[in-house]
Amino acid sequence: MTTVWKVLRTGREGVLSSAVVWPPLGLLYMVDGEWLRERWDGVFAFADAAQAREFADGLKPSCEIWKCEAESVHDVSHVLATYSLRWAVTGAHDKWLGLIRAGKLSSAREYARKAGFAQCYAPYGTVLCDGLRFIEEVST
């Protein structure tokens, strides 16, 4: 297992959601010790606590940083457009994600562009995890 850091926004009544809010990708999170697996294309997190802090500093005061345990961490930090919408192109999603997981990032970026995937941009230091489990809050 690998340690990663997840930045979450704090909403009304303590509801936690993804920090990169781009409808319809504003996912809600339950911090209950259970594994999150395969939400959309995986779960975004930060490989380094300092990078998570830098990103969170731009969101204050409405965020929390959580230390997490991660499964199958894929480094996508040098690819800006890293997220496709699952429903963008039927069947194309699996090919795109396969290219990311195989480390063929330039091919994945070109494939997404040609397939017309809707994209949002992941911050520097982002990793894509197949599974994520929240361990403890390290900062608010």
What are these regions, as identified by a protein language model?
Residues 1-30, 35-41, 49-140:
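Conserved NAD+-utilizing ADP-ribose enzyme module
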